[in-house]
């Protein structure tokens, strides 16, 4: 059938296509990725510089600690010569004992100016492992428009910068620092391949890589300009033509201007790249850097260990959202609120049958479901492997962006809300922000939470307030609860029996006309030690309403009763 599309009015003549690479015997299409690459996170540099409101020192530290916890061994921590804030952050993590694990290398970026190089190297004094990353733009438009220099002029910038890095490293860094060097011909994707090779060779001639003296050559798609296949061709060509290849770590740094950064990174690995630089969830300039989470989880979904821990993907997201003051899209691969949810009835039916088939297969083999190969329609991985459950995600299939609120409550107030309670509370915050506009501060979030869930002794509300209670257990294991209470303003004593204090309290509430059914109950300690308090969360059906309540007390039984009162009072508020 003929293509009926018509020419558009857009000025396509303004643009030219990308250059093809003359490499007829390319080998990368026949390769497979069977091991994880070296990873470098540049969230604290490339990611941070792209934020409207760059991270505060506290948020930077939270991001650094997250990256370390996840298992990243190379972390670009800033551009210390760009300002005092970045310099001070680098110094703070170096000077704090134990902040940087012994097997983690920090990296810092610099341009090829002597004053900047000196300041950059100075920031690394005392570091156990450190890399200086020097870059200069090499593409024709930069040579012509920005620097107004020849090829030789641009190459000399790279050579002189490399020499200065070596000199200042020898002058300022002691023997306790395991020093590394990285060079990037910025705008590699727009640079002629022969010139990119010429510059890299000149840099290596200066640095003299060899046994025990690696050089990292990073070939950035500073702006993504071609298909991933052409990007792979460029990497294979460079890998074939670089001298001293055995002493070179060939690194890829894709951006997502064409929306294919993940594919470009994966094909570059197939073409011989050793290392990938990127950011969690694709944060970065313009359309972002390549997404390290998607790359790692793509490996995981193919049975390849990414050597990064994504087992609590929502905790990673909460911290990321707090640090970046941004939200992860609900359709973001592997982590978005909707990615394990199917709205189509036929999809849901296929998923259910897939679960049933796996359970039957596991039973027939005499093993658990976790011991057999994952095979469920529409679910590329088992959501449980990243801390999710299919049922829980279904409950939030129209929600997004709740991680930041949960992060504030957990980190500021030690409250780890159950997932469904997060959803319930986030609706209250959303209503407040819709009504008032603008940002909502952590203090305001806590004020809303207290007013909604926790009793205010200065301004009590709700049908019920409880005071002292006592539980006894008979020989049959039945608990009887007696509790002093105020119901509708009148003091009374409530008495009920059941299988445990909560069941007994539900029975007692029936005596004052309140019918409560338990749907879910969770609890955790908020701290350690003799004065530790417990937080109890209870989901109740009260009439035709389903609501959560919370109770906080040093005694877990009292905390659970307070949680019931919280839910009941909310239902009648």
Curated annotation (Swiss-Prot):
Q: Which cofactors does this gene product need?
A: Mg(2+)
- Listed GO biological process terms: L-leucine biosynthetic process
Annotated PROSITE patterns: AIPM_HOMOCIT_SYNTH_1 (PS00815), AIPM_HOMOCIT_SYNTH_2 (PS00816), PYR_CT (PS50991)
What broad class of enzyme is this? transferase
> Any idea of its EC number?
2.3.3.13
Query: Molecular function terms in GO for this entry?
Result: 2-isopropylmalate synthase activity; acetyl-CoA C-acetyltransferase activity; magnesium ion binding
Q: Which domain of life is it from?
A: Bacteria
The family annotation for this protein states: Belongs to the alpha-IPM synthase/homocitrate synthase family. LeuA type 2 subfamily.
Protein name as catalogued:
2-isopropylmalate synthase
């Amino acid at each position: 059938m003929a293509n009926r599309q018509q020419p558009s009015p857009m000025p396509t003549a303004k643009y030219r296509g990308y250059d093809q690479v003359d490499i007829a015997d390319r080998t990368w299409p026949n390769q497979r990725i069977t091991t994880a690459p070296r990873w470098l996170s540049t969230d604290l540099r490339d990611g941070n510089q792209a934020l409207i409101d760059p991270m505060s020192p506290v948020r930077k530290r939270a991001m650094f600690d997250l990256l370390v916890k996840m298992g990243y061994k190379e972390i670009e921590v800033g551009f210390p010569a760009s300002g005092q804030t970045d310099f001070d952050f680098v110094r703070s993590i170096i000077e704090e004992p134990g902040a940087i694990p012994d097997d983690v290398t920090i990296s810092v970026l610099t341009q090829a100016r002597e004053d900047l190089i000196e300041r950059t190297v100075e920031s690394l004094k005392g570091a156990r492992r450190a890399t200086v990353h020097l870059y200069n733009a090499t593409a024709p438009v930069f040579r012509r428009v920005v620097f107004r220099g020849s090829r030789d002029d641009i190459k000399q910038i790279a050579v002189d910068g490399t020499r200065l890095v070596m000199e200042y490293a020898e002058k300022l860094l002691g023997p306790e620092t395991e020093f590394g060097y990285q060079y990037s011909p910025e705008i590699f994707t727009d640079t002629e391949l022969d010139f990119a090779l010429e510059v890299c060779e000149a840099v290596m001639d200066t640095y003299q890589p060899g046994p025990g003296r690696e050089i990292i050559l990073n070939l950035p798609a500073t702006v993504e300009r071609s298909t991933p296949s052409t990007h792979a061709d460029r990497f294979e060509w460079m890998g074939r033509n670089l001298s001293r290849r055995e002493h070179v770590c060939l690194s890829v740094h894709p951006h997502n201007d064409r929306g294919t950064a993940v594919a470009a990174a994966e094909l570059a690995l197939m073409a011989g790249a050793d290392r990938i630089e990127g950011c969690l969830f694709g944060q970065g300039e313009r359309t972002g850097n390549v997404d390290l989470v998607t790359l790692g989880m793509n490996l995981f979904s193919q049975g390849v260990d990414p050597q990064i821990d994504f087992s609590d993907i929502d905790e990673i997201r909460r911290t990321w959202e707090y640090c970046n003051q941004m939200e992860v899209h609900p359709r973001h691969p592997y982590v978005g609120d909707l990615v394990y949810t199917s709205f189509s009835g036929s999809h849901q039916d296929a998923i259910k049958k897939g679960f049933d088939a796996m359970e039957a297969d596991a039973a027939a083999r005499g093993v658990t479901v976790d011991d057999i190969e994952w095979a469920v329609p529409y679910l590329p991985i088992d959501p449980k492997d990243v801390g999710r459950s299919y049922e829980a995600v279904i409950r939030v299939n129209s929600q997004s962006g709740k991680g930041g609120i949960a992060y504030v409550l957990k980190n500021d107030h030690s409250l780890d809300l159950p997932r469904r309670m997060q959803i319930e509370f986030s609706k209250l915050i959303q209503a407040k922000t819709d009504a008032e506009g603008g940002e909502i501060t952590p203090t305001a979030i806590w004020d809303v939470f207290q007013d909604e869930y926790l009793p205010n002794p200065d301004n009590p509300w709700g049908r019920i307030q409880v005071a002292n209670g006592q539980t006894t257990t008979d020989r049959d294991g039945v608990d009887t609860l007696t509790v002093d209470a105020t119901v509708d303003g009148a003091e009374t004593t409530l008495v009920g029996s059941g299988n445990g204090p909560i069941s007994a309290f539900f029975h007692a509430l029936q005596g004052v006309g309140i019918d409560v059914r338990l749907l879910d109950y969770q609890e955790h300690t908020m701290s350690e030690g003799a004065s530790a308090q417990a937080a109890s969360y209870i989901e109740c059906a009260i009439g035709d309403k389903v609501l959560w309540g919370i109770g906080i007390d040093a005694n877990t039984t009292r905390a659970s009763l307070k949680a019931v009162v919280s839910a009941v009072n909310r239902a009648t508020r």
